[in-house]
Amino acid sequence: MQTLKVDLGERSYPIYIGEGLLDQPELLAPHIAGRQVAIVSNETVAPLYLERLSKALGAYSVLPVVLPDGEAHKNWETLQLIFDGLLTARHDRRTTVVALGGGVIGDMAGFAAACYQRGVDFIQVPTTLLSQVDSSVGGKTGINHPLGKNMVGAFYQPNAVLIDTTSLKTLPARELSAGLAEVIKYGLICDKPFLAWLEDNMQALRALDSAALTEAIRRSCAAKAAVVGADERESGVRATLNLGHTFGHAIETHMGYGVWLHGEAVAAGTVMALEMSMRLGWIDQAERDRGIRLLQDAGLPVVPPQEMTPAHFMEHMAVDKKVLDGRLRLVLLRQMGEAVVTDDYSKEILQATLSADYRAIVAQL
């Protein structure tokens, strides 16, 4: 087992990474203050791991809350089901909410924990690669709104993050690839040597090689922890973690939540960010193409939806959380391994990026 730390002073917490951690209650016990535990999961993950985790937490009074699966259910109605369960079972302020699932479950369970009786303890047990390397770390919680993704939520840090890498053995290949989009992101924004490692190990990762996955998760979580420790509430450097997300969120919102997986939309959005970075003269064509090939090798879509026009993108990006004083700030690459958040670009370059023929770009690789 490996242990990392998210350093937030008195609110610091550990990230445990290893095999078989779901069967080690001693890891979670120090982070559970009361006798009541609510395990929030979904209809896909619960049959696989809920009984196992409940057994490990047998010393506590465990309430299972099983929600419908998918991004389409990341809304007020589903969030209400968590509150219904907690109130019906009379859970008090010393309860601990445990999120068992992917990013949607983690975001909703965390938001519920932030709100219930004005805040109760919260533990993340992510079971997808995307949630293990990204959404479980850093305290972003929330739900979607019809007009924009993750527009309603709170910063609320967990007490601990427990990553059992064996849960990836039941992860569909499409979901694994979606998680790899976020892994690749770290190489692009802050760890150039990691890009070369990913190029050398991508097939091992897709084949679920345990050592490769553990290393990718460790390096990703270490990068995320460092950024969150420096900028918890995304007032500066943390926003660079959103490479590809502004374009990607527009895709998710326009196509309908869940039609494109989050990681798939981020991958296509990252290609657009690479293209715009190249048009600004910050990276060259070979570097753009290198990023696109790596995303392709991960089994990810690298062309935005053909039905989305530049006007569609602009409509959805206008409500992006990085908009300040009416100016859309974008996360772009100053160079490979270094990202910046900027509104220093011309409308012409943005329009050219939105209008680019990505099918032709990919075809010439």
Swiss-Prot record:
<feature type="binding site">
    <location>
        <position position="182"/>
    </location>
    <ligand>
        <name>Zn(2+)</name>
    </ligand>
</feature>
<dbReference type="GO" id="GO:0008652">
    <property type="term" value="P:amino acid biosynthetic process"/>
</dbReference>
<dbReference type="InterPro" id="IPR056179">
    <property type="entry name" value="DHQS_C"/>
</dbReference>
<feature type="binding site">
    <location>
        <begin position="69"/>
        <end position="74"/>
    </location>
    <ligand>
        <name>NAD(+)</name>
    </ligand>
</feature>
<feature type="binding site">
    <location>
        <position position="149"/>
    </location>
    <ligand>
        <name>NAD(+)</name>
    </ligand>
</feature>
<dbReference type="GO" id="GO:0009423">
    <property type="term" value="P:chorismate biosynthetic process"/>
</dbReference>
<dbReference type="InterPro" id="IPR030960">
    <property type="entry name" value="DHQS/DOIS_N"/>
</dbReference>
<feature type="binding site">
    <location>
        <position position="262"/>
    </location>
    <ligand>
        <name>Zn(2+)</name>
    </ligand>
</feature>
<dbReference type="Pfam" id="PF01761">
    <property type="entry name" value="DHQ_synthase"/>
</dbReference>
<dbReference type="GO" id="GO:0000166">
    <property type="term" value="F:nucleotide binding"/>
</dbReference>
<dbReference type="GO" id="GO:0005737">
    <property type="term" value="C:cytoplasm"/>
</dbReference>
<keyword id="KW-0862">Zinc</keyword>
<keyword id="KW-0963">Cytoplasm</keyword>
<dbReference type="InterPro" id="IPR016037">
    <property type="entry name" value="DHQ_synth_AroB"/>
</dbReference>
<feature type="binding site">
    <location>
        <position position="245"/>
    </location>
    <ligand>
        <name>Zn(2+)</name>
    </ligand>
</feature>
<keyword id="KW-0520">NAD</keyword>
<keyword id="KW-0028">Amino-acid biosynthesis</keyword>
<comment type="pathway">
    <text>Metabolic intermediate biosynthesis; chorismate biosynthesis; chorismate from D-erythrose 4-phosphate and phosphoenolpyruvate: step 2/7.</text>
</comment>
<keyword id="KW-0547">Nucleotide-binding</keyword>
<comment type="function">
    <text>Catalyzes the conversion of 3-deoxy-D-arabino-heptulosonate 7-phosphate (DAHP) to dehydroquinate (DHQ).</text>
</comment>
<dbReference type="InterPro" id="IPR030963">
    <property type="entry name" value="DHQ_synth_fam"/>
</dbReference>
<feature type="binding site">
    <location>
        <begin position="103"/>
        <end position="107"/>
    </location>
    <ligand>
        <name>NAD(+)</name>
    </ligand>
</feature>
<keyword id="KW-0479">Metal-binding</keyword>
<dbReference type="GO" id="GO:0003856">
    <property type="term" value="F:3-dehydroquinate synthase activity"/>
</dbReference>
<dbReference type="InterPro" id="IPR050071">
    <property type="entry name" value="Dehydroquinate_synthase"/>
</dbReference>
<dbReference type="GO" id="GO:0009073">
    <property type="term" value="P:aromatic amino acid family biosynthetic process"/>
</dbReference>
<keyword id="KW-0057">Aromatic amino acid biosynthesis</keyword>
<dbReference type="GO" id="GO:0046872">
    <property type="term" value="F:metal ion binding"/>
</dbReference>
<keyword id="KW-0170">Cobalt</keyword>
<dbReference type="Pfam" id="PF24621">
    <property type="entry name" value="DHQS_C"/>
</dbReference>
<feature type="binding site">
    <location>
        <position position="140"/>
    </location>
    <ligand>
        <name>NAD(+)</name>
    </ligand>
</feature>
<feature type="binding site">
    <location>
        <begin position="127"/>
        <end position="128"/>
    </location>
    <ligand>
        <name>NAD(+)</name>
    </ligand>
</feature>
<protein>
    <recommendedName>
        <fullName>3-dehydroquinate synthase</fullName>
        <ecNumber>4.2.3.4</ecNumber>
    </recommendedName>
</protein>
<comment type="similarity">
    <text>Belongs to the sugar phosphate cyclases superfamily. Dehydroquinate synthase family.</text>
</comment>
<keyword id="KW-0456">Lyase</keyword>
